[in-house]
């Protein structure tokens, strides 16, 4: 996914060049000026990395990011508080009409493909999961680990998200649960992806749902492994998960469409 994010730099250049003050001439150019952007917090690691590279290439340019929920990122764009919003969905017809009524004509550009990662405690022996069973867990049909694996010694499944207004919650409700509401007794939301990782690392029965960008192993310069604090589950689109048909959210599996919990970034 990282390789596709060179588009972010191009988008930032385009946004900078489009910014104009009310003075006689432009105050922002392709290589100078300051803009504010908003991004879903699940993308913070990769977006911040791209901003750092961009600003090192263009020292007179400044990008002021605001990492928040997807809902808030879109709202900030609607209120003209930021020049760019990075999210996992396009604008709705109502949102687009709001812009058009004010003579604004925003562009939607697909930047990359992201993946949702399912993480569990390192003491949890379960490493495979089907999309169907993931849906059963989210809707409350499967509440204990034995409902997924009869041999499991763990008890209840505690699912934790980063934020109730995040793109991960919306994606699971729309794309995994088919619009059904999430269970309220075993599904909860914290505030950030980092808090989810910490919670899962400390609770054997927990399952975290986070953006794959937060799982990078800082000691691995090849970016081919995940953080060792937790375990990343392999997910299958088939009825029965096996090592042969289950995939972890590595870049190659996202790119070729093998990983079933993939989503676009706009």
Model-derived features with residue positions:
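Pocket-flanking alpha-helical
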Residues: 71-102, 218
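Peptidyl-prolyl cis-trans isomerase
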Residues: 90-94, 103-106, 125-128, 181
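Short alpha-helix boundary/capping motifs
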Residues: 3, 82-84, 104-106, 227-229
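Short acidic (Asp/Glu) patches
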Residues: 100-104, 249-252
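Sec-dependent bacterial lipoprotein signal peptides
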Residues: 1-17
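Exported/periplasmic ABC-transporter solute-binding proteins
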Residues: 19-59, 63-66, 70-71, 75-78, ...
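Conserved catalytic cores of soluble enzyme domains
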Residues: 107-111
